[in-house]
């Protein structure tokens, strides 16, 4: 009999959460991660499912996600412990046929529940499904240190944050040409911040929560982790630049345009036109 803990999706979640903790992005129970699956992914492991799956209603219906399974991190769970006990810290859930709630099919033992940011995740999944024609499957939230630091010293608007991150490392424009969305500070774990994040996810694969963290979206766990890692590396460079007195020279507007043409991407117009 196949064991679900050996599946590609459980093993992928173990690696992503462990790597994020080692990066210092997910202290204590900080951060959350969800991966949209297909029925064919989970069907071989039905023997591992709970005999009586718990049902939890959603705070608002998600009809676009009806009958869709996900693997999610748990509320109050530490990323560093996922590798030690996947079943206690992760869960496979499946949205019901009307999108009004979900059943916990596997994991989240001892009456654990999914991440408190589940509304933000599911709303963002809905928008990324539409924006990418179903390609994006992952939503990752973490407390990337240098990205958080920048929200204290840069004006919190999409064009400026995007432009500075593009200048911090040449690869950034290629990796996230659509730029980085940013919210005002909001109370986490609410439908309101979930809706605001999802609205930005219509246009951007990265969304900053000032003084808190970042949301990233991508087609795979590796791609999503790499997206955040790339932005965080640029933010680290910028933090060092500002601590050394600021930029003396940088990548110019003309060079950014040339970079986009070379790699066949269309950079966010407002960031290109900023100066």
Curated annotation (Swiss-Prot):
The keyword Zinc applies. Pathway: Carbohydrate degradation; L-rhamnose degradation; glycerone phosphate from L-rhamnose: step 3/3. It catalyses: L-rhamnulose 1-phosphate = (S)-lactaldehyde + dihydroxyacetone phosphate. SMART domains: Aldolase_II. It is found in: Cytoplasm. It is an enzyme of class 4 (lyase). Binds 1 zinc ion per subunit. Its main location: cytoplasm. Its EC number is 4.1.2.19. One of its GO terms (biological process) is pentose catabolic process. Zn(2+) binds at residues 141, 143, 212. Keywords: Cytoplasm, Lyase, Metal-binding, Rhamnose metabolism, Zinc. The active site is at 117. GO terms for molecular function: metal ion binding; rhamnulose-1-phosphate aldolase activity. CDD domains: Aldolase_II. One of its GO terms (cellular component) is cytosol. Gene3D superfamilies: Class II aldolase/adducin N-terminal domain (3.40.225.10). The keyword Transcription does not apply. Pfam families: Aldolase_II. Catalyzes the reversible cleavage of L-rhamnulose-1-phosphate to dihydroxyacetone phosphate (DHAP) and L-lactaldehyde. Homotetramer. HAMAP family: RhaD (MF_00770). PANTHER family: FUCULOSE PHOSPHATE ALDOLASE, RHAMNULOSE-1-PHOSPHATE ALDOLASE. This is Rhamnulose-1-phosphate aldolase. The lineage of its organism: Bacteria, Pseudomonadati, Pseudomonadota, Gammaproteobacteria, Enterobacterales.
């Amino acid at each position: 009999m196949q064991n679900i803990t050996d599946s590609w999706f459980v093993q992928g979640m173990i690696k992503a959460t462990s790597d994020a903790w080692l990066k210092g992005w997910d202290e204590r129970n900080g951060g959350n991660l969800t991966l949209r699956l297909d029925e064919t992914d989970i069907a071989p492991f039905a023997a591992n499912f709970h005999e009586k799956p718990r049902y939890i209603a959603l705070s608002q219906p998600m009809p676009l996600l009806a009958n869709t399974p996900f693997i999610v991190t748990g509320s109050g769970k530490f990323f560093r412990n996922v590798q030690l006990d996947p079943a206690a810290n992760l869960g496979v859930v499946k949205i019901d046929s009307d999108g009004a709630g979900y059943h916990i099919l596997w994991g989240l033992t001892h009456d654990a529940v999914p991440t408190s940011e589940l509304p933000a995740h599911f709303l963002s999944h809905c928008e990324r499904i539409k924006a990418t024609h179903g390609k994006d499957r992952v939503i990752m939230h973490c407390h990337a240190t240098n990205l958080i630091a920048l929200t204290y010293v840069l004006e919190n608007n999409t064009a400026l944050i995007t432009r500075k991150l593009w200048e911090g490392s040449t690869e950034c424009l290629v990796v996230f040409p659509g730029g980085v969305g940013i919210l005002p500070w909001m109370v986490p774990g609410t439908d309101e911040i979930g809706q605001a994040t999802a609205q930005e996810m219509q246009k951007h694969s990265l969304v900053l929560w000032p003084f808190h963290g970042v949301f990233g979206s991508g087609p795979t766990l590796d791609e999503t982790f790499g997206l955040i890692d790339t932005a965080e590396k640029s933010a680290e460079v910028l933090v060092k630049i500002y601590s050394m007195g600021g930029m003396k020279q940088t990548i110019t507007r003309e060079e950014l345009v040339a970079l986009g043409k070379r790699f066949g991407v269309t950079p966010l117009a407002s960031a290109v036109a900023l100066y």
